[in-house]
Amino acid sequence: MAEKQTAKRNRREEILQSLALMLESSDGSQRITTAKLAASVGVSEAALYRHFPSKTRMFDSLIEFIEDSLITRINLILKDEKDTTARLRLIVLLLLGFGERNPGLTRILTGHALMFEQDRLQGRINQLFERIEAQLRQVLREKRMREGEGYATDETLLASQILAFCEGMLSRFVRSEFKYRPTDDFDARWPLIAAQLQ
């Protein structure tokens, strides 16, 4: 029984990895059909549906992975780092680095892979970005409590500016077919962001 569960879990992971790889390839800029995905995995469409009731559930699983990866690591940054600017820098670097290491998933983050899918999937990505923006806003607001002095600019505006930078770099990465890596020149770009944190 345990072997059967492990085999099923492995096949599910194989399907998700194949979907992520297809999103990374030129196929990712077009609608991915279950027929193409089944051929990529080397199984029938019926076999895909034994593991996932729909393609939407496959995307849901990839979005869950993205959410878990990013939110867990953001929480670790907040636990380990106390300096506000360092926290913000690490969160930005996390978002950009995650996108760079996972090009196929970046197509999901930017919404490109979801254009032909159910609207609720884009809604989940929107919620993820709202959660990240709320975390950034909280980090910015805690500066006053931690360091005795806040920012001259409203924290909501600063948080949206930081997140817009990240989203822009991820979109540029996808638009360039993964040529312009989000972390390229980060050490030169970060001071431009940090200069806004006054």
Curated annotation (Swiss-Prot):
<keyword id="KW-0131">Cell cycle</keyword>
<keyword id="KW-0175">Coiled coil</keyword>
<dbReference type="GO" id="GO:0010974">
    <property type="term" value="P:negative regulation of division septum assembly"/>
</dbReference>
<dbReference type="InterPro" id="IPR054580">
    <property type="entry name" value="SlmA-like_C"/>
</dbReference>
<dbReference type="GO" id="GO:0005737">
    <property type="term" value="C:cytoplasm"/>
</dbReference>
<comment type="function">
    <text>Required for nucleoid occlusion (NO) phenomenon, which prevents Z-ring formation and cell division over the nucleoid. Acts as a DNA-associated cell division inhibitor that binds simultaneously chromosomal DNA and FtsZ, and disrupts the assembly of FtsZ polymers. SlmA-DNA-binding sequences (SBS) are dispersed on non-Ter regions of the chromosome, preventing FtsZ polymerization at these regions.</text>
</comment>
<comment type="similarity">
    <text>Belongs to the nucleoid occlusion factor SlmA family.</text>
</comment>
<protein>
    <recommendedName>
        <fullName>Nucleoid occlusion factor SlmA</fullName>
    </recommendedName>
</protein>
<feature type="DNA-binding region" description="H-T-H motif">
    <location>
        <begin position="33"/>
        <end position="52"/>
    </location>
</feature>
<feature type="domain" description="HTH tetR-type">
    <location>
        <begin position="10"/>
        <end position="70"/>
    </location>
</feature>
<keyword id="KW-0963">Cytoplasm</keyword>
<dbReference type="InterPro" id="IPR001647">
    <property type="entry name" value="HTH_TetR"/>
</dbReference>
<comment type="subunit">
    <text>Homodimer. Interacts with FtsZ.</text>
</comment>
<dbReference type="InterPro" id="IPR050109">
    <property type="entry name" value="HTH-type_TetR-like_transc_reg"/>
</dbReference>
<dbReference type="GO" id="GO:0003700">
    <property type="term" value="F:DNA-binding transcription factor activity"/>
</dbReference>
<keyword id="KW-0238">DNA-binding</keyword>
<dbReference type="InterPro" id="IPR036271">
    <property type="entry name" value="Tet_transcr_reg_TetR-rel_C_sf"/>
</dbReference>
<keyword id="KW-0132">Cell division</keyword>
<dbReference type="GO" id="GO:0043590">
    <property type="term" value="C:bacterial nucleoid"/>
</dbReference>
<dbReference type="InterPro" id="IPR023772">
    <property type="entry name" value="DNA-bd_HTH_TetR-type_CS"/>
</dbReference>
<dbReference type="InterPro" id="IPR023769">
    <property type="entry name" value="NO_SlmA"/>
</dbReference>
<dbReference type="Pfam" id="PF22276">
    <property type="entry name" value="SlmA-like_C"/>
</dbReference>
<dbReference type="InterPro" id="IPR009057">
    <property type="entry name" value="Homeodomain-like_sf"/>
</dbReference>
<dbReference type="GO" id="GO:0051301">
    <property type="term" value="P:cell division"/>
</dbReference>
<feature type="coiled-coil region">
    <location>
        <begin position="117"/>
        <end position="144"/>
    </location>
</feature>
<dbReference type="GO" id="GO:0000976">
    <property type="term" value="F:transcription cis-regulatory region binding"/>
</dbReference>
<dbReference type="Pfam" id="PF00440">
    <property type="entry name" value="TetR_N"/>
</dbReference>
